[in-house]
Amino acid sequence: MEVLMAERANLVFHNKVIDGTAMKRLISRLINHFGMAYTSHILDQVKTLGFQQATATSISLGIDDLLTIPSKGWLVQDAEQQSLILEKHHHYGNVHAVEKLRQSIEIWYATSEYLRQEMNPNFRMTDPLNPVHIMSFSGARGNASQVHQLVGMRGLMSDPQGQMIDLPIQSNLREGLSLTEYIISCYGARKGVVDTAVRTSDAGYLTRRLVEVVQHIVVRRADCGTVRGVSVSPQNGMMPERILIQTLIGRVLADDIYIGPRCIATRNQNIGVGLVNRFITFRAQPISIRTPFTCRSTSWICRLCYGRSPTHGDLVELGEAVGIIAGQSIGEPGTQLTLRTFHTGGVFTGGTAEHVRAPSNGKIRFHEDLVHPTRTRHGHPAFLCSIDLYVTIESEDILHNVNIPPKSFLLVQNDQYVESEQVIAEIRAGTSTLNLKEKVRKHIYSDSDGEMHWSTDVYHAPEFTYGNVHLLSKTSHLWILLGEPCRSSLVSLSIHRDQDQKSAHSLFVKRRSISNLSETNDRARQKIFSAHFSGQKEDRIADYSDLNRIICTDHSNLVYPAILPILAENSDFLSNLLSKRRRNQFIIPLQSIQERKKELMPCSGISMKIPTNGIFCGNSIIAYFDDPRYRRMSSGSTKYGTLEMHSIVKKEDLIQYRGVREFRPKHQKKVDRFFFIPEEVHILPGSSSISIMVRNNSIIGVDTQITLNIRSRVGGLVRVEKKKKRIELKIFSGDIYFPGRADKISRHSGVLIPPGTRKTNEKESKKVKNWIYVQRITPSKKKFFVLVRPVVTYEIMDGITLATLFPPDLLQERDNVQLRVVNYILYGNGKPIRGISDTSIQLVRTCLVLNWNQDKKSSSSEAARASVVELRTNDLIRHFLRIDFVKSPISYIGKRNDPWGLGLLADNGLDWTNINPYSKARIQQTLNQNQGTIHTFLNRNKGCQSLSILSSSNCSRMDPVNGAKYHNVIQESIQEDPLIPIRNSLGPLGTSLPIANFYSFDRLLTHNQILVTNYLQLDNLKQPFQVLKLKYYLIAENGKIYNPNPRSKILLNPLNLNWYFLHHNYCAETSKIMSLGQFICENVFIAKKRPPLKSGQVILVQVDSVVIRSAKPYLATPGATVRGLYGETFYEGDTLVTFHYEKSRSGDITQGLPKVEQVLEVRSVDSISMNLERRVEGWNKCLTRILGIPWGFLIGAELTIAQSRISLVNKIQKVYRSQGVQIHNRHIEIIVRQITSNVLVSEDGMSNVFSPGELIRLLRAKRMGRALEEAICYRALLLGITKASLNTQSFISEASFQETARVLAKAALQGRIDWLKGLKENVVLGGVIPAGTGFRGLVHPSKQYNNLSLETTKKNLFEGGVRDILSHHRKLLDSSLSKKFHNTSHNTIHQTIIYRIYNDS
């Protein structure tokens, strides 16, 4: 007993946690020492002990064990503070969106990581035996990052595209997630349930493909006799010691190892732990080991090249199916790999920059000419040095020199005082490494509506010369000047002053308009009923956004209703005024609102009809009158009478709708009577079919319940029709007759019967008193009856003449103007008319048609321009419709009846709706505008008003559409220069006519492009803003005015203008600081003790105040593309800028299983094959230079295949190791050997054996070359595992994998033979598999292969470095081969890869 105690005392006692890795090591050492049987006993005891202890101690996990880290609160608060500052900088336009995204991700990632590091120390201090803490090292799901999500914070998540979502999840799972955090978390937490399911299937399929490639590889020989090996060097320290040991243990040496003269290990010796330790201790020369790559066999492997069996630690047995073991060793751990893409999402990797810190306090000095200013990735200012830069730091007693490498960012200024350890420079990481970058585009969208403006020059992207994509050449701001775009070009606003001229565009609209689509001529036309206009102040703009498309294309016109003639007490004044009119003007007075109330005729009397461009052609309708006698409240249909009885109008000559511009004779045919057949119609939604209480074809009385909330207004026959999404329920009033004979009825179906006709189908015949409409109803096949419906007859009378509409004195001097009255029927024959919610239906419309005598001599067509003039007398506002005749050469675009309206080009450039945007013709016109402008000057001193008319001589303009140059000629005011410098003037932006003084500045309206700015009188501005101006001109910071797209109309809200009142002391300096048109970023202080300004453009500078139009800055860096044109209107959500930035696509985007699969299928993006091709060329060039042509190709190709194999093994191992999965290299090597051992036969060689383009095994090609004694030309090829499975020697194996029919058909046509060498084909056919015990029955005793002596002929062809490159190949060419080789023609060898160095047999 004492002896035992003494022995035990000598044993080493380990007080350590044994994890999985340590357990593996323990078991392998036990097997080495005691063998398999004894080890299993020991392990049983360990198992029993473990279960006993676990039962005794048993930890439980409760929710209270999840202790949140105390420092979390202030860490998160700090990060939030940083994010807030970042957000402000973005708002002020100091950083752009990409920089903001990068910075915010870094802030939150750092916070999350810091919390994670805090976690373990916190547990150790507060509760070392906490179950959560104990479990956090158990591996699998119990690792630090899982626990971090429970007690730290969940952190940043990726979206499905792998982009980071920059909103971090601040809560942990213990605190619980908010709704937003939960949704984001669902994005990132794919790797939960879904991942596990997907991963299992993916890993299963990967295993299947791997096994398919290598199922035939079995250990068949003891030694293949190869002299080649792969060299592993313990000297250079490139490989970590752990990996070196893993690589070496279990292998077989390919060469003797010497230390000095002493041999410490011999060829074919098994490497154990002791030997490895000696190698590491002695730092031996590179060790050459045998691997599956070096084995000389074609379809099997030898014991020595495979090495030790992982199960029992001895050399592998003959007949072992090592291929299948390899496939499963790689495939099975696939389920442990994650499918996740790592946290970085690639946004800030490649940017973990190294920092240079100041060695001491002091002033920093450097050569300023060697650096130029730039921005860092986060948008901070910095200097970029393009060459090495020497920086000196002068402290009190010492000078420090710091060398900063090229392409680094200097973060301090010259002569700045720096403190010790302050970061002074950032070295760009990844300049030397080969990690690939991917280009990413990020679009920035507009936050608000407004006009685009940029403050720098841009140039067209070369591929978008005609598009609207511009590239920025330097860092600058893009501004969106806020304003609400008027989505329709039909309505505009003007500030309405006394005696101003108003064009037809600027009528105020008081109520929102309603839209009513009426069916006419089988084509939907748009009628817009808008409300009255007046000069009153409380005006709102009409909402036309929904009608915009229809109006623009269909060119229907706004209808301004209810303007009646004036019959007022002061008409003598008016006639005096109007009698002076010239020949080319025609003025119609209109009624004002005050008088309309006194009128007996209802409001909807005469409605004005003015085209959108204000231009009339001949024969236009200028007004219409809806006669109340032809108005119905109920639905029904119109009939023009039957063709038999009243053949007045042929069907195709039906009266057309009012929208035609010119009347052809057929439209003026008089219809002296028409008929209206009333019916009651209810349109119900399709879902309400259940609630209808009456049946189809039933007869009901008045006030019958039809549905739950509708009662019938008339009695009669019910018809229910189902349309697509609705139900039409009609009630026809009338009498029902059951006829005697069918033939009479057929004549009277759907016809109108005049009075006096006898009803023949009754016993006693009565005469019909009124018109009736006979309609045949067939409820079922056998039954039918006739419905006789009452008809309302309308006679059309020519009661209305011009004399009833206008005072006679106005109609005397009509000169060449003709007005005619024409009646229309608005609805076609038999068309159903639907009344919508008790609105009345107008059946006949009386139209006023304007025409004038055309001047036949002149070729140009004469057009009339309409405008509304307002005159105020005795505080009574009068409106006149003034029609001016202008002679103008009008350019027509395309065909006469093009789909965009009449194709007229408006002479004032405002009627853009008519321009056909697809027309290629150049449109050039010079228009002489005979339009006067009534304009008042307010002279405050005299207190009286004077009237001045700017006539057409004062404003003219040339407007070629493509040249877009504007010549502004306004007498005695402006030089002929389209860019007006106005930088230093007071007054609103865009004006250059100081009238009297700037207090009485008034609106000047001309048709000059630059001055058409409806500016407001400044006195009005100080009142609460109601309606602000229509259109601004953009002014650049250099003081030039740019006229933006004349189509755009911007309305400004009161919210968009900021009015700042300045103290009078600051006025003088303010006007210097602020020039008109200047852009101001937010947070600028204009005066002391004043609040900072909002960002915007200065549009008005006065003595005591400034008006700033709100604008939002967007920062853009060089290379960004700007969408849209200068001055273009942007709506909220439109793309403004696209940034192109690089993010590194290092190994962390695809991870885990997808990555392994990518490598094995050889289709990775940074594809190995690409690298290999480059590498081949590189090797070939270098070696050709060193060795001359034939040698170069020969050795280059061999090295390429060796390099690619090693590279593939390393890539696959890297993925598994990163996930903590250990796989022995030899398994991966067996797989890689299979996918790299195929070659493609080139065109020019071996034509008698292989066809060009055929895939053959590398060793087969070599053997064939030896047999035929000629050089073979082929290319090395990387096949993916799927392709390799479909290119094996066995067609049965291929057919059982994929594409069975194709493989078998091809094999039959080629006459392939399957030698049944692999396992799978034998399983398919039910034979004995050639592995394990089945292998011994196949092998016949033969002459031992490895008794052959190996000749080694040493030639000093290669010395030093080249010998290293060639991986210590023992056997080089003997002299006979080299002679043969040099005799081969020069051309054959060129550009071919020839594997003939090693004479293998």
Curated annotation (Swiss-Prot):
Main localization category: plastid
GO molecular function, one term: DNA binding
Pfam families: RNA_pol_Rpb1_4, RNA_pol_Rpb1_5
Top-level enzyme category: transferase
Top-level taxon of the source organism: Eukaryota
Entry keyword annotation includes Protein transport: no
GO cellular component terms attached to this protein's record: chloroplast; DNA-directed RNA polymerase complex; mitochondrion
InterPro entries in alphabetical order: DNA-dir_RpoC2_beta_pp, RNA_pol_beta''_euk, RNA_pol_Rpb1_3_sf, RNA_pol_Rpb1_4, RNA_pol_Rpb1_5, Rpb1_funnel_sf
Gene Ontology biological process terms from the UniProt entry: DNA-templated transcription
Keywords linked to the UniProt accession: Chloroplast, DNA-directed RNA polymerase, Metal-binding, Nucleotidyltransferase, Plastid, Transcription, Transferase, Zinc
EC number: 2.7.7.6
Cofactor field: Zn(2+)
Binding site for Zn(2+): 224, 295, 302, 305
Compartment list: Plastid, Chloroplast
Reaction catalysis annotation: RNA(n) + a ribonucleoside 5'-triphosphate = RNA(n+1) + diphosphate
Record text on cofactor binding: Binds 1 Zn(2+) ion per subunit.
Function of the protein: DNA-dependent RNA polymerase catalyzes the transcription of DNA into RNA using the four ribonucleoside triphosphates as substrates.
Oligomer status and interactors: In plastids the minimal PEP RNA polymerase catalytic core is composed of four subunits: alpha, beta, beta', and beta''. When a (nuclear-encoded) sigma factor is associated with the core the holoenzyme is formed, which can initiate transcription.
UniProt-listed PANTHER family: DNA-DIRECTED RNA POLYMERASE SUBUNIT BETA
Family in the record: Belongs to the RNA polymerase beta' chain family. RpoC2 subfamily.
The protein's name in its UniProt record: DNA-directed RNA polymerase subunit beta''
Species for this entry: Ipomoea purpurea (Common morning glory)
